[in-house]
């Protein structure tokens, strides 16, 4: 596990095109030279940008405070629910927020939550694949074996918890996860295997695997198809349909971004992975078209249009990949790859704010590299709190990025 307190090498990371003099940090470089052809000193630390951009987007969305509040005593969350009921019954417009009262408020401070922790979970699989445990396997088989080991280890915890509960769904687990992930783990615990674990799943369509796919892309920088295939292998544990298509799209976009730092190329790579006859395919093409035809005002200007034409207000959860992935691609396009524009705009779309800002941040962070992340956000978001995966508390994303960048699996030729 990666802990805070150690200094990561500033020069590690997959290489990106050289940035012209005077170009603002975070703006996409458009040098035609391929990343792998640049000298070592030109590295922009795109893996660091990817992880920190994802974490900053995760932190920027309003649900992050509720996720992080899980580290507070249960009675504080119960009181918040009671205050919400009071507001409803008494027609008051003063709405409650997560509270600390007489408890230390540290868990409620700005920082990453569940998306960043599940991204780190996948990053551990990359490091496992790069280690000696699976060194006798081929490159592709090592990654798939590491992913399978990680999921089955969690499923074993579910099985053990289920033995102490009347049914799998009510088992008390040492983790917090999306409905799709919990259902997938429950399926694994009962003996099912992918793709059944993702197909026989009430939330097969959500974007949980899309977040994981962002990290898996580092294994295939510049190879969108290979990155998408690996993301699909992982996604099948918890998703089906648009949930899988979205994972393929995000992996393809970020794999392209890691090698070219060209936002249009990255978005096109994502669209290639989205069948036109699917909801996510139709939404993504429409959203990107909106971004490209309304470029004057930047990302913030198209927020109302995306809200009215892409975001759905019918279902009880705003985590459908068919909404969040198109929003992320459109805002990255409208922001011209600038993380500091795409993430705040995504956070304005409150219904999809649980993951759309994280997806937009991952893509634009990979495009801009580690230096595109504002210093204050870097410090606030580099350390995981363990609100979803307690064993990851204290994990330093900057150090994790350096470790990922140093493995043979993340180099273009491996």
Tell what function each PLM region has.
Residues 1-15, 22, 26-414:
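Structured, active/binding-site neighborhoods that engage oxygen-rich ligands
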């Amino acid at each position: 596990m990666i802990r805070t307190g150690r200094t990561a090498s500033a020069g590690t990371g997959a290489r990106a095109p050289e940035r012209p003099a005077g170009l603002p940090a975070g703006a996409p470089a458009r040098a035609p030279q391929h990343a792998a052809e640049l000298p070592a000193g030109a590295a922009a630390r795109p893996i660091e940008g990817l992880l920190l951009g994802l974490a900053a987007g995760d932190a920027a969305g309003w649900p992050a405070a509720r996720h992080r509040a899980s580290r507070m005593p249960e009675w504080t969350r119960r009181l918040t629910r009671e205050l919400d009921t009071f507001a409803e019954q008494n027609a008051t417009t003063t709405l409650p927020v997560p509270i600390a009262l007489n408890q230390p408020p540290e868990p409620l401070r700005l920082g990453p939550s569940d998306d960043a922790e599940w991204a780190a979970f996948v990053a551990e699989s990359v490091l496992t694949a790069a280690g000696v445990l699976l060194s006798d396997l081929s490159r592709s088989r090592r990654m798939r074996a590491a992913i399978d080991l990680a999921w089955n280890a969690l499923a074993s915890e579910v099985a053990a918890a289920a033995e102490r509960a009347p049914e799998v769904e009510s088992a008390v687990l040492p983790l917090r996860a999306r409905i799709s992930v919990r259902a997938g783990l429950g399926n694994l615990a009962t003996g099912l295997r992918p793709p059944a674990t993702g197909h026989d799943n009430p939330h097969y369509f959500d974007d949980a695997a899309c977040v994981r796919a962002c990290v898996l892309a580092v294994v295939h920088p510049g190879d969108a198809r290979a990155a998408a295939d690996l993301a699909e292998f992982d996604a099948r544990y918890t998703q089906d349909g648009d949930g899988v298509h979205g994972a393929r799209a995000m992996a393809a976009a970020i794999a392209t971004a890691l090698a070219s730092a060209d936002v249009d190329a990255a978005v096109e790579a994502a669209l290639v992975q989205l069948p036109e006859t699917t909801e996510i395919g139709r939404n993504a093409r429409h959203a990107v078209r909106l971004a490209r035809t309304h470029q004057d005002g930047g990302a913030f200007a198209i927020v109302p249009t995306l809200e009215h034409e892409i975001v759905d207000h019918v279902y009880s959860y705003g985590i459908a990949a068919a909404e969040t992935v198109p929003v992320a691609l459109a805002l990255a396009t409208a922001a011209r790859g600038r993380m500091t524009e795409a993430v705040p705009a995504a956070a304005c779309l409150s219904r999809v704010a649980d993951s759309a800002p994280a997806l937009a941040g991952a893509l634009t962070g990979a495009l801009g590299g580690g230096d595109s992340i504002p210093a204050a956000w870097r410090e606030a978001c580099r350390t995981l709190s363990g609100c979803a995966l307690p064993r990851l508390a204290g994990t330093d994303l900057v150090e994790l990025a350096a470790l990922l960048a140093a493995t043979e699996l993340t180099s273009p030729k491996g």
